[in-house]
Amino acid sequence: QKISVEGRIGSVRWTVDRADSTLFYGLAMDGKKGIILDNFSLRGSSGLSLRGIPQQMLRQFNEQRPYDLIILEYGLNVATERGRNYDNYQKGLLTSIEHLKNCFPQASILLLSVGDRDYKTEDGELRTMPGVKNLIRYQQNIAAESGIAFWNMFEAMGGEGSMANLVHAKPSMANYDYTHINFRGGKHLAGLLYETLIYGKEQYDRRRAYE
């Protein structure tokens, strides 16, 4: 359901006749201006579970909230230290992306690669897990095969060993598991992604001007 209200809202109340027959997926209270962002956090997910969301439900979401851009960022927990073969992951994520395309036909889709993830070698040195680099190659292929945009977050972070640099930054921008960024790190990477998107838009506008 969608309700439009003019002016300021002080409070909102919903009343249902039977609680057992009512299911709330969420609440959005957006204005008519600016950028609207919905964040669907699926912690620990590889992104393959998106295939299981019924098409009818997603299409109903699209009727109420027709997205311009869908950003996918999964895979950190898929990577293993020496992982080389991610064929099943590639096949599954391609299916998930096609599923989203069918349900949100107007939306562009951007796939973010996994970031750096470090481990300690036998000599005690911090190095990027080889499996991370292999997974990123698979993710690049996924984006190319499905015809969607791709952003290499690993390279944006600084490439090889960059997670350790974020951990040891002052103040720190990542956790001492050398896997997860913190809020400061998230803000830092968000700024880099924003700059990339704006630069891409500027280049697109310049090309269009010469057509």
Where are these regions (language model features)?
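A generic secondary-structure signal
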Residues: R59-F61, H99-L100, T196
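Catalytic His-Asp segment of secreted/periplasmic serine-dependent ester chemistry enzymes
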Residues: Q55, D116-E211
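Generic beta-strand/beta-sheet core signal
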Residues: F40, L72-E73, L112, L135, ...
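Conserved SGNH/GDSL esterase-like catalytic core that processes O-acyl groups on lipids
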Residues: Q1-G92, H180
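Loop/turn elements at helix/coil->beta-strand transitions in domains of secreted/extracellular proteins
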Residues: I35-I36, R65-I70, F104-I109, E145-A149
